[in-house]
């Protein structure tokens, strides 16, 4: 971890001391009642250029390839490593060549296999300041789902910030901090050249509000309402051609792509759909804020 991150050392130590039995006991009712498609295999496929979807039918896991190793964004549930490996190999690459691990949000459904893949690949875990602590204590400090360890803690090697450009080989990936869903939620964007055209591509963390989360009075996460508002404004201002998200249902995966479908760079072109989804989520947010203020 970078020298300016030593202030979080106690959380790393805490994570290492968490009893294994506590981790095994983590699947409480809210963990067990997960959608079936989160664990349902789905073929790996090319989204556009050097961006591949290698997750499940319901969970977005994305591989960005370069000439000097690869970036993996998200994992799935704790037993998802074999599936992710198989999907990566099916599109012509190797899990062991992953150099950087990223996540869009520090919730167990996107982080539970990070520690295992980090060890297998020898990759570095990069994360925003807002999510790093949650990653390192296995979800214990999460403002909404916390109070228990919900995934294997993963050590963060580097803090990334809004606007930063992640460079790996020929990849230039921009970090967009889009907090609200978690304090450190983030999206990632890059430009892809295909067929003489440049496409603006974003791996977007959408501003969804978990059931039971309060926005106006939420002492475990001060400023969450303002964070959501900034995220919606930021996303509406983005120039996007192609987008994917943390859940297949959020970006219409199964409407846009069928297994075995021939590759086209235009399959996931959907700027109107992105804006419509952001505006839909913003309307839900505004309605909840108004209700809480009554």
PLM ranges: what are they?
Residues 4, 21, 31-37, 195, ...:
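Accessory terminal helices/loops
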Residues 2-19:
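Bacterial N-terminal signal peptides that target proteins for export
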Residues 16-29:
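Bacterial N-terminal signal peptides
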Residues 80-81, 106-112, 132-135, 183-186, ...:
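Active-site environment of divalent metal-dependent phosphoester hydrolases
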Residues 51, 79-82, 89-165, 263, ...:
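Active-site HxH/HxHxD metal-binding segment of metal-dependent hydrolases
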Residues 37-91, 95, 187-209:
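Conserved beta-strand hairpin/beta-sheet module of binuclear metal-dependent hydrolase folds
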Residues 34, 40-42, 46-48, 97, ...:
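Metallo-beta-lactamase
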Residues 73-75, 98-107, 126-128, 178-180, ...:
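Active-site neighborhood of phospho(di)ester-bond hydrolases with catalytic His/Asp-centered motifs
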């Amino acid at each position: 971890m970078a020298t300016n991150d030593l202030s979080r050392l106690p959380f790393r130590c805490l994570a290492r001391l968490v009893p294994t039995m506590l981790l095994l006991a983590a699947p409480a009712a809210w963990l067990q009642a997960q959608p079936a498609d989160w664990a349902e295999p789905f073929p790996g496929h090319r989204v556009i250029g050097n961006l591949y979807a290698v997750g499940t039918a319901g969970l977005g896991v994305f591989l960005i390839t370069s000439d000097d190793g690869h970036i993996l964004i998200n994992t799935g549930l704790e037993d998802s490593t074999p599936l992710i490996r198989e999907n990566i190999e099916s599109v012509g690459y190797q899990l062991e060549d992953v150099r950087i691990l990223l996540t869009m949000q520090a919730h167990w459904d996107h982080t539970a296999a990070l520690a295992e893949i980090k060890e297998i690949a020898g990759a570095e875990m990069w994360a925003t300041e807002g999510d790093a602590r949650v990653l390192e204590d296995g979800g214990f400090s999460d403002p909404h789902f916390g109070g228990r360890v919900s995934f294997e803690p993963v050590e963060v090697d580097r803090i990334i910030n809004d606007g930063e450009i992640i460079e790996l080989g020929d990849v230039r990936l921009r970090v967009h901090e889009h907090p609200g869903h978690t304090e450190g939620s983030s999206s990632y964007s890059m430009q892809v050249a295909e067929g003489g055209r440049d496409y603006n591509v974003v791996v977007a963390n959408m501003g969804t509000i978990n059931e039971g989360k309060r926005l106006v009075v939420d002492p475990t996460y001060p400023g969450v309402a303002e964070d959501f508002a900034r995220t919606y404004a930021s996303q509406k201002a983005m120039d996007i051609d192609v987008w994917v998200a943390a859940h297949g249902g959020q970006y219409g995966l199964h409407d846009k792509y069928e297994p075995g479908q021939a590759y086209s760079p235009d399959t996931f072109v959907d700027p109107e759909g992105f804006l419509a989804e952001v505006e839909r989520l913003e309307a839900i947010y505004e309605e909840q804020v108004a209700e809480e203020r009554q």
